[in-house]
Amino acid sequence: MYDTQVMIVGAGPTGLTLGIELARRSISFRLIDAAAGPFRGSRGKGIQPRTLEVFEDLGIIRAILKAGVQYPGFSVHIGPLSLRLGPMGGRKRATEGVPYPNLWLLPQYRTEQILRERLAQLGAQVEFGTAFERLSPDNRGVRVHLSSGESVTAEYLVGCDGGHSAVRKALGLGLRGDTLHTEAAFVADVHLEELDHTDWHVWPFAKGGSIALCPLPDASFFQLMSPREPADGIEAAILRATGCQVRQVAWSSMYRPAVRMVDQLRVGRVFLAGDAAHLHPPTGGQGLNTGIQDAYNLGWKLAHVLRGGPESVLDTYEAERLPVAAAVLGLSKHLYRTRSLKRGDATNQLRLHYRTSTLSLGKPLGRLHPGDRMPDVRLADDTRLFEQMCGTHATEFVTREGARILIRPDGYIASIGTQRVTSYAGEPTHVVDGSATDLDRSSIHS
């Protein structure tokens, strides 16, 4: 007898996304977090285009777009000279295939708040002040021991509890990789009224490194980034660089830039996701986004198996996400080493794919392969394909040539063929007439 189907440890963006995915499929779960209350810092402030597509499916894209802004341009200050540069990643126009082409700026605490509000709409909530202590796995489930003294038996446990993951440590798994800098770096949210709020300001140091202030959507707040905590205090360091007085320090944190990951994402009935499985430096805005993608990949698979689907489906979580984590870590490391302000298409996560997955079947159709992200297209009735895909179902897209593209619940192509597929992952497929569309024009793959 189980107390709940899934126990989720950690209520950051990864755990919240997983909770939403389970809640909208009517899977019972508990979502616990050791913190006394919600996270209040801006830390993971960059939301990539692929994550914005996920947020459309989760039903929160309007709230996310309303609360955030496009990334600002840079002002680099060297003595009396100020150079104004374009925004990170440039500014791209939305296309038929890519409705959200630009990196979106939103403080992490606000992203989490919107995710919690969506979770509440689905009838669930976070249990703050409840810590995971240890686990007792067996073949039928996982017994989770909590700081309250309670023991909970779940069919599956998912550790989404960050870089210092207690779940990962309980499994005996280590993080392999590199520490990129021997000294801890510093980040803080500061209130400045005198500094121009339209640009991301950077003051390079003569011996390397810089102090930077990125404007946040909240009026007059900036995210401060520094190679180390200023010896004479935040206020003095900012006054020295900018001539501006700090009105408030709302949040601050130290971190040691690293690229590290586990060798496996699953041990029996226990899974790891997000920073519990892979640690990223802040460069490239990959950490928060990769964790959300982990949860988005795992959620529908857990639900399918809990409804009677084959257990082997869960093996594809590690098979699909571990190579992605390795690739993203490599990109983050490169961006950190080069210190480049330029961002190419590699950071937007739109080209990540699962072509080698056992769930990807059939032959390519033009530039589209099984395992690719399905592009958005405008349909004959003037709706968008992504609108038709929203929900927990898989979608079957029928081309003008009669090919049938089966799209998984997470937006990736499961198969390309000619046979009608009536159900996928335990739910009826939704058929979409794509006879009036040009897929090659929408695809970003080659």
Q: Model segments located where?
A:
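Active-site-adjacent segment of FAD-dependent monooxygenases/related oxidoreductases
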Residues: 43, 48-118, 216
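N-terminal Rossmann-fold NAD(P) dinucleotide-binding loop
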Residues: 15-16
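A conserved short coil-to-beta-strand element within the FAD-binding core of flavoproteins
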Residues: 128-142
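Conserved FAD-binding catalytic core of PHBH/FMO-like flavoproteins
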Residues: 117, 156, 160-257
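Core beta-strand elements of the Rossmann-like FAD/NAD(P) dinucleotide-binding domain
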Residues: 2-4, 147-156
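Helical substrate-recognition/capping region of FAD-dependent monooxygenase/halogenase enzymes
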Residues: 1-5, 9, 24-25, 34, ...
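FAD/FMN-dependent oxidoreductases across multiple families
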Residues: 67, 229-290, 322-324, 328
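Glycine-rich FAD pyrophosphate-binding loop
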Residues: 23-44
